[in-house]
Design a protein with these regions (language model features):
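Serine-hydrolase catalytic machinery in alpha/beta-hydrolase-like enzymes
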Residues: 15-119
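Active-site signature of alpha/beta-hydrolase-fold catalytic machinery across serine-
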Residues: 54, 136-140
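Alpha/beta-hydrolase-fold catalytic nucleophile elbow
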Residues: 71, 125, 149-152, 173
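Flexible "cap/lid" loop of the alpha/beta hydrolase fold
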Residues: 79-86, 152-171
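Gly/Ala-rich beta-loop-alpha elbow adjacent to hydrolase catalytic centers
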Residues: 125-130, 134
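A conserved short beta-strand
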Residues: 143-155
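C-terminal catalytic histidine-bearing segment of alpha/beta-hydrolase fold enzymes
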Residues: 171, 183-227
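Short beta-strand/loop motif that positions the catalytic acidic residue
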Residues: 171-174, 178
Length: 227
């Protein structure tokens, strides 16, 4: 990178440094005292951990799961200025952000397992931008993933180049009027998975870029089979 000042060229170099920050996550304990599986949620862009957790609690049967909602590290104020929301990453320093996020997820899940009675079963559930994090955590996280729920978000391109990934069962959901996760994007994801002999479950429903009761019921059945 260079800038021109007084007819002279000034060279500017870009660097990165590893920094420590604190992440935030919410836990909804199960209704039972016995060890339970973990359902880990990743919210969409401009949302927060509370928003995603509220959706997870509405899924039938999740009272028998430990619910864990992780908030993205990049916080900012909502347009109204009344709420603190987050995103997972931007295109800037993308590879470093992916590494940081996967390490963050590893630490959160590990901390929860150390302090709560859980089984070995972990399912990652993402909405919108959070879908990419669910896929990445499943593919490269330290904790074995037993299922992925992907609502209204696509598979990150870098994972398509890694044929060594052992994918767990996958449920992909899309609203028929969703203008962000289009039918073409869903078809592209399914085409990729079919090319590696993975056949995700799918749920199409009459709505847009959102959670619905129909989809939550489908997730409930998916989780029942995994548990």
């Amino acid at each position: 990178m260079a800038i021109i000042k007084n007819n002279s060229t000034i060279s500017i170099s870009t660097h990165t440094v590893k920094a420590t920050t604190h992440g935030r996550y919410l836990i909804r304990r199960p209704s039972t005292s016995v060890a339970t599986p973990i359902l880990v949620g990743f919210h969409g862009y401009g949302e927060h951990a509370e928003r995603l957790l509220s959706e997870l609690t509405l899924i039938p049967g999740t009272d028998e799961w430990l619910l864990l909602s992780i908030q993205g590290l990049h916080r900012f104020y909502s347009k109204s200025g009344r709420h603190v929301v987050s995103s997972w990453m931007t295109r800037q320093d993308r590879d470093s952000a992916i590494t940081d996020n996967v390490a963050y997820i590893n630490d959160v899940v590990g901390a929860v397992r150390e302090t709560h009675a859980t089984t070995s079963t972990v399912v990652y559930c993402g909405f919108s931008q959070g879908v990419a994090m669910a896929y990445r955590a499943a593919a490269h996280g330290n904790h074995r993933c037993h299922g992925i729920v992907a609502l209204a978000g696509d598979l990150p391109p870098e994972l398509q180049d890694d044929r060594g990934i052992k994918w767990p069962p996958i449920l992909i959901g899309r609203g028929n009027t969703d203008e962000w996760y289009t039918q073409d994007k869903m078809n592209a994801d399914l085409t990729f998975f079919h090319s590696i002999n993975i056949k995700p479950e799918t749920c199409r429903f009459n709505a847009g870029h959102e959670w619905t009761e129909d989809f939550r019921n489908h997730v409930s059945q998916f989780l029942r089979h995994i548990r």
